[in-house]
């Protein structure tokens, strides 16, 4: 018991130390900017740390410590529970196509669910009926690449009901995939896949067709 208490005290002491001396915005781009932190190691040695943010300088999470999600991704199944809606999208950093969940940014004044419905039509052409049941904590903001950016995103769940046609922007190159479980497993084995998509494909493989959102309940 004494050993455990000592470890807890060490953790508190470590968390209380000073981690940085200052922060500076280094770029002034429209959508994404680079920040430099004058960081301090555990022994006080200074080093350079860099991260990117979509937020303006006053709202970077380094300052606000907010969990507010900048974007969301959509776990959308067909009405029979047999297929998961994916996108295969060209991504410039990889110079290749990646399998992903439909996703996008939450616009000012939108809820995450409203953004999900809008993005589903834009990216896939499918109307989305949002599923609201289950544990609310599963829909809160979670950080995406915390070593590189302060961005967080939430997950929205639902069923696609009607195909009305894609409304992609000219800058987007997106193919819509309706993946059954056999195709989902193939994608996991063979394709280039985003982390969020990979995790939810694993979930889809184990989900019941008759109760596709049962995993949202504790």
Please provide the spans of the model-predicted regions.
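Short, Lys/Arg-enriched N-terminal segments with co-localized hydrophobic residues
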Residues: 2-9
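Acidic, metal-coordinating catalytic segment for phosphate/diphosphate chemistry
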Residues: 29-73, 80
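Short loop segments at secondary-structure junctions
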Residues: 42-43, 78-81, 90, 159-164, ...
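Conserved Nudix-box catalytic region and its N-terminal flanking loop in Nudix hydrolases
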Residues: 63-118
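Short, amphipathic C-terminal "tail helix"
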Residues: 200-218
């Amino acid at each position: 018991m004494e050993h455990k208490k000592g470890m807890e005290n060490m953790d508190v002491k470590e968390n209380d130390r000073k981690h940085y001396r200052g922060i500076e915005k280094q770029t002034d781009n429209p959508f994404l900017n680079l920040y430099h932190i004058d960081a301090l190691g555990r022994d006080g040695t200074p080093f350079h740390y860099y991260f990117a943010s979509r937020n303006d300088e006053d709202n970077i999470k380094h300052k606000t410590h907010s969990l507010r999600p900048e974007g969301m991704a959509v776990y959308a199944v067909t009405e029979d529970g047999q297929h998961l809606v994916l996108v295969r999208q060209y991504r410039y950093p990889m110079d290749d196509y990646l399998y992903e969940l439909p996703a996008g940014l939450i616009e000012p004044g939108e809820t995450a669910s409203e953004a999900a419905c809008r993005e589903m039509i834009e990216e896939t052409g499918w109307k989305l009926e949002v599923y609201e049941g289950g544990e609310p904590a599963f829909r809160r903001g979670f950080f995406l690449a915390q070593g590189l950016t302060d961005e967080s995103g939430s997950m929205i769940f639902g069923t696609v009901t009607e195909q009305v046609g894609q409304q992609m922007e000219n800058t987007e190159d997106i193919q819509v995939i309706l993946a059954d479980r056999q195709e989902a497993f193939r994608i996991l084995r063979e394709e280039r896949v985003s982390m969020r998509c990979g995790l939810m494909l694993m979930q889809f493989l184990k989900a019941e067709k008759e109760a596709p959102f049962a995993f949202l309940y504790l």
